[in-house]
A protein has these predicted regions:
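Short beta-strand/loop motif that positions the catalytic acidic residue
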Residues: 227-229, 233
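N-terminal cap/lid segment of alpha/beta-hydrolase-fold proteins
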Residues: 23-57
Length: 287
């Protein structure tokens, strides 16, 4: 029992060390004059919540933001408040999504079904605020990149699979410093074994689960795709972005890859960063 406790403690320490929570970017506004904000509960759990942020004028479209944190409890949508404000200031409506993570009722399949239900609940907000849902773009950071890609892949999931038959479909998707290949992430032990913790085990043990949620196994996505990462990312290796972009392009997807010199894993959360400017440039150029 003592050895088991030591191993669990070591794993938890590794997870915390691999995804230590960044501070909010200094000197960056998180609110926009004239914006409207409303919080929606899409389930009974405290983490089953999303915040709608609307610009003062008619929005250009809706961005679904999915935060990271290696799918571990203790991280939430406030990680993306600064980039959410930047989007609203640029005329986009934002659906900033929370979900249950490992240690907070999440894991397999709850983390995935939460993200699916949360994205679909956007339809409720759209009816209340007369929002068009023909231009909905998912943007995810780190572990949220995995989930954003998976949201785009949902229309192709088999009946009965977690997240199948989406109510709201993504028209484009961006993954920023994302864990885009879960099987490779499991093999490489990313986040101290975080991939196995959210899927329930390794690809060898749960091949059928990985087939349903691993973005690298769900290509092509069939929508415009941005893959962006910092060249100095030491949390999620750059190969996760380069290799996924190459595989998506080979599968026939419209892919843009941006590897930003001198930036690391958390720069994407700062709207002043080159990584975020790459996201905005791609987003604002979408048809």
């Amino acid at each position: 029992m003592a050895r088991r406790g030591f191993l669990l403690g070591s794993l938890w320490s590794a997870l915390l060390g691999a995804c230590s929570r960044p501070g909010a970017p200094r000197g960056v506004p998180t609110k926009v004059p004239g914006e409207r904000r409303q919080t929606y509960q899409y389930g009974r759990a405290a983490a089953q919540v999303a915040e709608l942020r609307l610009p003062a004028a008619a929005p250009r479209g809706v961005v679904v933001l999915v935060h990271g944190g290696y799918w571990q409890a203790g991280y939430d949508r406030t990680l993306q408040d600064a980039v959410a404000a930047d989007l609203v200031g640029g005329g986009w409506a934002v659906w900033n999504l929370d979900y249950r993570a490992v240690g907070d009722g999440g894991g397999w399949p709850t983390t995935f079904t939460d993200v699916a239900a949360g994205a679909d609940h956007l339809a409720v907000a759209a009816r209340e605020h007369d929002l068009a849902l023909d231009r909905v773009v998912a943007i995810g950071h780190s572990a949220g990149g995995t989930l954003a890609l998976w949201l785009a892949a949902r229309p192709a999931l088999p009946a009965g699979a977690p997240g199948a038959a989406p109510v709201v479909r993504m028209s484009a998707v961006a993954t920023a410093a994302g864990v885009n290949d879960l099987a490779a992430g499991s093999r490489d032990g990313l986040g101290g074994g975080a991939v196995g913790s959210v899927v329930g085990g390794s690809p060898a043990d749960f091949a059928e689960r990985y087939a349903l949620v691993d973005p690298s196994r769900l290509l092509p996505l069939g929508v415009p795709l941005l893959v962006v990462t910092g060249a100095d990312d030491s949390t999620v290796p750059v190969s996760q972005s380069r290799d996924f972009a190459a595989a998506a392009r080979e599968a026939g997807d419209d892919v843009r890859l941006e590897v930003v010199p001198g930036e690391g894993h958390f720069d994407q959360l700062d709207p002043r960063s080159g990584s975020w400017r790459a996201v905005r440039s791609w987003l604002d150029a979408l048809p």
